[in-house]
Amino acid sequence: MIRLNWLFRSSSVLLRSQVRLLHVGDANVLHSEVDKQSAEYKENAREMASLVGDLRNFTSQVLKGGGQKAIERHTSRGKLLARERINLLLDKGSPFLELSALAGHELYGEEVVNSGGIVTGVGRVCGTECLVVANDATVKGGSYYPITVKKHLRAQEIAQENRLPCIYLVDSGGANLPRQADVFPDKLHFGRIFYNQANMSAQGIPQIAVVMGSCTAGGAYVPAMADESIIVKKQGTIFLAGPPLVKAATGEEVSAEDLGGADLHCKTSGVTDHYALDDEHALYLARQIVSNLNLSATNSYNDQLMHSSQVNFQTATPPSAVEEPRYDAEELYGIVGPNLTKSFDVREVIARIVDGSRFTEFKKLYGETLVCGFAKLYGHTVGIVGNNGVLFSESALKGAHFIQLCAQRKIPLVFLQNITGFMVGRDAEANGIAKNGAKMVTAVACANVPKFTVIIGGSYGAGNYGMCGRAYSPRFLYMWPNSRISVMGGTQAANVMAQITEDQRKRAGKEFSEEEAQKLKAPIVEMFEAEGSPYYSTARLWDDGIIDPANTRQILGLSLKAALNNAGQETKFGVFRM
């Protein structure tokens, strides 16, 4: 009996120990409280699915480039389309993270400039992450509109920040002449492309050009300033002035091929280094150049991540070592709806993004409207900052503290934005919301680690700044299709303008009727509604693309992998007003 009791007691102790170990092992797992049978969840899921459907429709349209006739004209010359070229350039089966696919969306009225006339993104070539810029000659002859320049420069900025080799697939007629005032003369116009090339080359970031079509006027400097350049026989041309301008200026009549073709530049001028017989050969040569860059190939994201770009290439398989989230990413549709007045717990979003849905929260009981903590993303430690309401002083102080920790430990930061702004009012001001908010903004601005931002809801006012908006140089910034971005909400802006007008009328001894107020408010609300749209934002490159919420984990993983080529430097903070 005694022995039996001892065995029973021992078994109980062992059982309790196992339960405790299991509990401790799962202590940082986020447990979802989402009710998938609730009316709100189902309504959100329907509405978000509709928004994602719209996104897919818009994306499918831009993939058509300049339209069927332009595509037929282009391919009849034996030329591949821009995205086909990228597909052949990249390692087979590897993902391509296309950026700003909807740049230029409805930006020029009846002029359709799909993808801004240029395809940019990050992909893997011979085991090395590279930044690819490919002109789409089916869109206005590949000419540079203002948005084309902006998108090209943004791609180079990403390459420089993350130390990614640049591969330019050139097929462009140069600057769009009718819009030359917005393309040519200013600091961040066309000339900055070549400035960036020169400086990146000086920093040891390889610059490779593949001339697969026209390369005219200033555009001729893309291959001329590249570390190595390739040109395609009887297809690629490079000249500062084309045949019409040469004839007008000198009276000389010359063909494009004789003026600047592959034979001239490979055999006589020396502008190009490699002679390609066709597009496929040129892309093979480009891969050979990358293979000889003498860069240590990192663990490619092809080995770590499932493909989720906007280009439908083959799917890459993630390794078994990576712990997938415990919850289905498509549940995000039901958690976050288009009605931004309805609150949700950002932890439910985090649980569907990070490895194993594991999240070690920082200062959980303090400043509860800001959620901060550590997690793994494809095996890499990241710090996550997510909104759960308006930012109070306590929230801002907590955020500043956490960002400092990540900067000190060189841990990348992920910001999940759904923010109406900082708290306002007499009590908030008395409690120092201005200086405490400034601490968080300072921390975000100075933290010299890779930062990534996803706008999952609202992005309003100074809250955009505190949560690493575009002005704070996140390495990549994405938006969900339900998101909104404005200095404030349309209704609030309309009420402010109406109040100012009413006060002005009163001082002048005049009345301001309710009818007049409504007449004033309506166009303001309409304007803010239009300009707050994620499509308005992405058309102007205020972000790096609108993404399907269900792909957030994969896209952040691809972005993180690219950024780890330059994991950041020592952080120095300025003065924090105490």
Curated annotation (Swiss-Prot):
Residue numbers spanned by region Carboxyltransferase: 48-570
Principal localisation: mitochondrion
Transit peptide: 1-29
InterPro entries assigned: AcCoA_carboxyl_beta, ClpP/crotonase-like_dom_sf, COA_CT_C, COA_CT_N, MCCB/AccD1-like
Expression sites by tissue: Expressed in third instar larval ring gland (lateral and medial secretory cells and corpus cardiacum cells) and CNS.
Top-rank taxon, per record: Eukaryota
Domain CoA carboxyltransferase C-terminal stretches: 321-570
The UniProt record lists the keyword Plastid: no
Pathway as given in its UniProt record: Amino-acid degradation; L-leucine degradation; (S)-3-hydroxy-3-methylglutaryl-CoA from 3-isovaleryl-CoA: step 2/3
Compartments in which it is found: Mitochondrion matrix
Single GO cellular component term: mitochondrial matrix
Stretches for region Acyl-CoA binding: 355-388
Enzyme Commission number(s) of this protein: 6.4.1.4
GO BP: any one term: coenzyme A metabolic process
Catalyzed reactions: 3-methylbut-2-enoyl-CoA + hydrogencarbonate + ATP = 3-methyl-(2E)-glutaconyl-CoA + ADP + phosphate + H(+)
Family that this chain belongs to: Belongs to the AccD/PCCB family.
Protein name according to UniProt: Probable methylcrotonoyl-CoA carboxylase beta chain, mitochondrial
Provenance organism: Drosophila melanogaster (Fruit fly)
Gene: Mccc2
